Amino acid sequence: GMASKAGTIAGKIAKTAIKLAL
């Protein structure tokens, strides 16, 4: 549902942020 979608989006943003930080 909405919760899992939000979690997936948050995960993608986190991965992108980590890549940019490196």
UniProtKB/Swiss-Prot annotation:
Any one Gene Ontology BP term: killing of cells of another organism
UniProt keywords, alphabetically: Amidation, Antibiotic, Antimicrobial, Fungicide, Secreted
GO cellular component: extracellular region
Main location: secreted
PTM-bearing positions, type Leucine amide: 22
Superkingdom to which the source organism belongs: Eukaryota
Subcellular location, record wording: Secreted
Keyword Secreted: yes
Tissue: Expressed by the skin glands.
Family recorded in the similarity comment: Belongs to the gastrin/cholecystokinin family. Magainin subfamily.
Protein's job: Has antibacterial and antifungal activity.
Protein name: Peptide PGLa-B1
Origin species: Xenopus borealis (Kenyan clawed frog)
